[in-house]
A protein has these predicted regions:
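Retroelement reverse transcriptase polymerase core
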Residues: 1-118
Length: 118
């Protein structure tokens, strides 16, 4: 396994000045119940999921950060943004809305697929 660099940001000050999204998260007990009853189950863990979400062009300026190498802006969602989990959950819920509770559940970057038959 190759070592990889992971960018880490201290976003505490930015998060203190950010409006907090209060999108509700799925009921974990309901997810566990549906999956436990299924004969077949799969779990997909999306790698670096937040970093695959683009930030709206008009909001990129809000992501400015400085390093010893210069000042930069992020064009993708970072793990430390306070609204990253709720934004990502909203997106996954929108994508899978027709299947949620039927044979799919989504909790943040995990997709659970379940059924009684193949």
């Amino acid at each position: 396994m190759h070592p990889t660099l992971r960018t880490v940001f201290n976003l505490r000050q930015q998060n203190e000045n950010t409006w907090k999204d209060v999108t509700p998260f799925p009921d974990q007990d309901a997810i566990h119940h549906d999956i436990a009853r299924a004969t077949f189950r799969s779990k997909l863990d999306m790698t670096e999921a937040y970093e695959k979400m683009r930030i709206r062009p008009e909001d990129v300026g809000e992501t400015t950060f400085s390093t010893i190498f210069g000042t930069f802006q992020s064009r993708v969602m970072q793990m430390g943004f306070c609204n990253a989990p709720s934004t990502f959950q909203w997106l996954m819920t929108a994508i899978f809305q027709d299947f949620l509770g039927r044979f799919v559940h989504v909790y943040l970057d995990d997709i659970f697929i379940y059924s009684q038959s193949i």
